[in-house]
Amino acid sequence: MGKIIGIDLGTTNSCVAIMDGTKARVLENSEGDRTTPSIIAYTQDGETLVGQPAKRQAVTNPQNTLFAIKRLIGRRFQDEEAQRDKDIMPYKIIAADNGDAWLEVKGQKMAPPQISAEVLKKMKKTAEDYLGEPVTEAVITVPAYFNDAQRQATKDAGRIAGLEVKRIINEPTAAALAYGLDKEVGNRTIAVYDLGGGTFDISIIEIDEVDGEKTFEVLATNGDTHLGGEDFDSRLINYLVEEFKKDQGMDLRTDPLAMQRLKEAAEKAKIELSSAQQTDVNLPYITADGSGPKHMNIKVTRAKLESLVEDLVNRSIEPLKVALQDAGLSVSDIQDVILVGGQTRMPMVQKKVADFFGKEPRKDVNPDEAVAIGAAVQGGVLSGEVKDVLLLDVTPLSLGIETMGGVMTPLITKNTTIPTKHSQVFSTAEDNQSAVTIHVLQGERKRAQDNKSLGQFNLDGIQPAPRGMAQIEVTFDIDADGILHVSAKDKNTGREQKITIKASSGLNEEEIQKMVRDAEANAEADRKFEELVQTRNQADHLIHGTRKQLEEAGDKLPAEDKTAIEEAMKGLEAALKGEDKAEIEAKTQALVQVSGKLLEMAQQQQAAAGGDAGDTSAKKEDDVVDAEFEEVKDKK
């Protein structure tokens, strides 16, 4: 069996590693570097350049030099992230026919997985040159907060590059594997703080060692994928542009060539300021006007850079608190802190993390290489080269379906270990309902519409039955790559429908973050909404039952009692159209009071009939959830 290589497909840089005996080895590319810039250029003479050669010619070819493509992979054109990048990137971001964010290069439309595949091809070639044999299988890493669409798109990129992606693995988890594999760590709980070029993740991971076998179990994960080195660069670029404008009265933003030079200089200055207290951004002939050429020479101190990005660093702290809370741990329970991603070399980042955890982060993990090493270890586990290692990862957000009253009913909660499968039995909301719509949702809110819709499908051919009698079993199945499969089965007829959530309907990371933030900020509103829905459902059941009793025993009631019940039902139905929980409760109580006589008669009638009519209602299975389907009409 050939080697399964490990690839860290990064926003800014990528890296490839293999298992060499019992050790993972990071491989040098054809330029002699252990990491490769994730930059792809299409030249005028039709050549495709990847990595350092592409970066070197970016200044003279900004429109056709593509970088930070990972920020677009698996995204819709209308997503906030894609729209923001559209305005600031020198290359052209367009809408594909299916609504995805694509790119236009030299008049040709290209999909992000197609472009990322060029980087993966270079990683594949680097491994093949070292091994002297073809490579066809890989483990590729993604941010822990990547959703279904982004994971699918990453797998597609691998396939385009000629690789069978054996496993998609989360970056912080890969870093933990790299850290824990060759160390006699015993049982430890570690925090992996991963601040890369485009994304931020935090994972709390427990490493258990029993009889030489190590289990890496992710307890909780959180993150913010609008946070990374690219954002730090942007702050410095904006500062330099404004300073130049004050000094020379010219706005460099209108000049793509100048902006490309400035981007390179800002990145270099940021890196230098991790070891030096100040640096010069010196760009002669940056632009020109009628009076002649203009030069940029601006001093930047470390303190200035820190003041520009302080809020970005602070933004990474909130997810740390949430992850610890989700794991049920406190700061004192964390034994080791591991920093991953080039941006963690910034002293300010290291200090903030050390202050939060009350301990210095470990310095024996290479932040640029740890993720690729972990991916290679997982490749070794899958190929059988690495024994005695078990990896247990989690899903970052809750998954569920919409049920009666517009409620999100979770089937799999966030931070559940994957792969996992969960089934639950639901029922129908109407008498003789022949079809149900399964509306799949992702998020933490109680109200269905406040979560992200992942897709919907119909299960029809249900046998006609009174409401609440049909048994619809919904199954959610998440595979080891974190990709979701949903099925619905009518237990009476055996009819079944399945759906694999497709990439075009995935969540973007901004939405995930928004959901989690909203869930925290709106916990009280969610609780009130849940109570309102419960009250509504109880009232709805009461109306349904009373109407049935009226049909069966109403002719034995005095006319004025019957009229009073009908009026009370009308009043309750009117209250149900509003949002006032107190009014619904009051009208429910009113209906209960006036229908007391009717209930007595219905019970007497049932007793006289030997209780036959009561048998059917007892047949409802114990595990049927008291939340029901309504048919969801597509909003056109």
Swiss-Prot record:
InterPro entries for this protein: ATPase_NBD, Chaperone_DnaK, Heat_shock_70_CS, HSP70_C_sf, HSP70_peptide-bd_sf, Hsp_70_fam
Modified-residue entries (Phosphothreonine), positions: 199
Region described as Disordered: spans on this chain: 603-636
GO molecular function: ATP binding; ATP hydrolysis activity; ATP-dependent protein folding chaperone; heat shock protein binding; protein folding chaperone; unfolded protein binding
GO CC annotations, alphabetized: cytosol
CDD domains (UniProt xref): ASKHA_NBD_HSP70_DnaK-like
Pfam families reported for this sequence: HSP70
GO biological process, one term: protein refolding
UniProt entry tagged with the keyword Lipid biosynthesis: no
Statement: the UniProt record of this protein carries the keyword Transmembrane helix: no
Induction annotation: By stress conditions e.g. heat shock.
Source domain of life: Bacteria
UniProt entry keywords in alphabetical sequence: ATP-binding, Chaperone, Nucleotide-binding, Phosphoprotein, Stress response
Its biological purpose: Acts as a chaperone.
Record-stated family: Belongs to the heat shock protein 70 family.
Protein name: Chaperone protein DnaK
Organism whose genome encodes this protein: Yersinia pestis
Species lineage: Bacteria, Pseudomonadati, Pseudomonadota, Gammaproteobacteria, Enterobacterales
